[in-house]
Amino acid sequence: MNYALDALWWKLTSQPVRDLASLLTAPPLWQSGCELGVRELLGERGFRYLLALDADPAPLTEHLTRRAPFGHRLGIYAEELLAFWFANAPHAELLAHNLTVSGSDGNTQGAADFVARLNGKPYHIELTCKYYGGGTGRLEDMRGLDPKDTLLGKAAKLTAQLGLPHTSDGIRTLRQHGLPLDVKPVSIVRGIGFFPHGFHAFEPPLNPYGWRGIYIQDWAEYGFKRQEVRYHLLDRMAYLAPARVAETETLNATEIRRIDQGLIAVLECRPDGFWHEIERIMKAV
C-alpha cells in the first residue's frame, strides 16, 4: 500500500496535524495481534476534529512547544502528539502517560506509554514508529538506518511492553495511581517497510497492506524513469507523514544521487503549489 497517496494528504496542510493524522490513520507496519483500530482511535467525530485543528493548529503547536525540545527523538515527538489527542479528542480521556512500573525492590521494570479511555473503555496503549528495510524482504534482514535496530528485536520488545501492566508489579502500579485494573493492552505500530522493486512475498507478522517504500543500496537500482518528479531528503523528525514541501526544499535527480544514506521522498507538484510525496525510498549503505 502507498499510504502517501491517500486523499487525506490533499486536504491537511499543518505539519504537526499531518504528523498526528498519520499516527491515527496509517496502517500498522507489522501485526502485533492486538492492534488498536483506526475507528477506535478517531472516534465518530475525530476526523472533523482533525480538520478543525488543521484550520487552527494553535492548541496542538502550543502543546508541542511546552514539551519541546525533543532532542531529535522521533518517538518522543510522536508520543506527545498522541498525548495531545488522548487529552483533547471528543471521545478520549488521558489517564496516564509514561507510567513507570517498578518492582517490589524499587527497580524499574518499564513504562506504559499511555493509559487512556476511548469511548469509555480503558486501554493500555503502546506506540512504536519504525522504518525498516532490507534487500531480501526477509524478517531477519529488516533493519533501520542504524543496523542495530531490527524489526524482530523491536517486535519482541513491544510484546513484552504490552504485558507489563498485567504483571503483579503492573497491577500494583495501576492500583497505586487509582487507574482501572481492566485495561485492554493494544498497540499502535506505525512506520514504513522498505523492500526491493517488485517484492510482494511478505512474511508474518509484516502487514501486507502496510505503508511500503523502495529499498536500495545503489542509486542505479532506482531507475529514475519519471522526469517530472523531484526529491527531498527527509529530516528524521519529518518521517511520520508524507512530505509536503516548497520547491526550494527539493532536489533534482543529479543532486539526490549524492545522498549516501537516508529516507528520501519522491515528489510531484500539486495544484496548491507544494511538492507532495508520492513514494519513499530508503537509501542504505
Predicted regions and their residues:
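Intrinsically disordered, low-complexity Ser/Thr/Pro/Gly-rich regulatory segments
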Residues: 1-285
